[in-house]
Amino acid sequence: MILATTSSTCATLGEMVTVLSIDGGGIKGIIPAIILEFLEGQLQEVDNNADARLADYFDVIGGTSTGGLLTAMITTPNENNRPFAAAKDIVPFYFEHGPHIFNYSGSILGPMYDGKYLLQVLQEKLGETRVHQALTEVAISSFDIKTNKPVIFTKSNLAESPQLDAKMYDICYSTAAAPIYFPPHYFVTHTSNGDRYEFNLVDGGVATVGDPALLSLSVATKLAQVDPKFASIKSLDYKQMLLLSLGTGTNSEFDKTYTAQETAKWGPLRWMLAIQQMTNAASSYMTDYYISTVFQARHSQNNYLRVQENALTGTTTEMDDASEANMELLVQVGETLLKKPVSKDSPETYEEALKRFAKLLSDRKKLRANKASY
């Protein structure tokens, strides 16, 4: 979608709920990290503030799998109550830790990676920080294999579900614990009245199939109902939403299609390998299609921007290839994506659309600050 400033948008900008959603995709998280770095740089330039951070501008930041990790990095506070990581720190994080995270365990019967290094680095970076301390509302998904239900970690749910005030490193590992790749994660939380809760969690993509945009919008809707700063919003609809959704790239080889004659001879293993790829691609497409349709039906299509590379090839399609050569290729994918047109119908590039998005975010922040001062 092409983001544009309209008179109706400006009229209600101060009351808009801003949402950032980041897909899952393992090491391919480098692609949205490049986009986030560009956007944060634009916000710093527009507001003439080198300390400006994404968490200052978005009411809700949601992510699944590697998107959940990015969410935690830009919302978890440091000792100065500022995000412990700037957007420009994310790509170096992948380069430093990616090869150790995706270091084959050598196990034939167990998961491909033991997850020990991932959990260790998350503990070191995120410390004892819990959900309630996040600098803005978060929406990080996981799936409990014991209860067979999704688990959504958000600040706005804590009043009714205090057991969800887990440590951020437990949440981040859980949302990244993709079956086959990493072991499930078990941890326990205790509420203030002494109740004990157990969690047996795997990758959030099981709950959201990689794209948490709809989840993030749902959390934003609830936030507008319970947060006093949105008291002037009587009935939230998509006209009052500003959504930026970042993908981790799709495999262009998925588009080669298969014939009925070819697949008729496939066995369970061949289908198992192909169907996950098909499901992820189809789900991401349908999520984007649904959101686009709903925003358009509300005459708010300019409030939604999906940034996605749809032509990944070779090693860049792999979520666990953390070789330096492949990570460099993923950086190039992200940088090239910024120069590509948002749609076939317009010459506007993602870079130009994100600059416009940054201006809207800045204006919205200033309008809300001015309103709060009266």
From Swiss-Prot:
MF (Gene Ontology): monoacylglycerol lipase activity; nutrient reservoir activity; phospholipase activity
Motif (GXSXG): 63-67
This protein's UniProt keywords: Coiled coil, Glycoprotein, Hydrolase, Lipid degradation, Lipid metabolism, Plant defense, Signal, Storage protein, Vacuole
Catalytic residues of the enzyme: 65, 203
Location of this chain's protein in the cell: Vacuole
Motif (DGA/G): 203-205
One annotated Gene Ontology cellular component of this protein: vacuole
Residue runs in coiled coils: 309-372
GO biological process terms, semicolon-separated: defense response; lipid catabolic process
Keyword Lipid metabolism on entry: yes
Residue span, PNPLA domain: 20-217
Residues carrying a glycan: 103
Gene3D superfamilies linked to this entry: Cytosolic phospholipase A2 catalytic domain (3.40.1090.10)
InterPro entries, sorted: Acyl_Trfase/lysoPLipase (IPR016035), PNPLA_dom (IPR002641)
Motif segment (GXGXXG): 24-29
Signal peptide: 1-11
EC number(s) reported in the record: 3.1.1.-
Family named by the database record: Belongs to the patatin family.
Function recorded in the entry: Probable lipolytic acyl hydrolase (LAH), an activity which is thought to be involved in the response of tubers to pathogens.
Comment text on domains: The nitrogen atoms of the two glycine residues in the GGXR motif define the oxyanion hole, and stabilize the oxyanion that forms during the nucleophilic attack by the catalytic serine during substrate cleavage.
Misc. remarks from the entry: Patatin have a dual role as a somatic storage protein and as an enzyme involved in host resistance.
Protein name: Patatin-2-Kuras 4
Organism whose genome encodes this protein: Solanum tuberosum
Upper lineage: Eukaryota, Viridiplantae, Streptophyta, Embryophyta, Tracheophyta
Gene that specifies this protein: pat2-k4
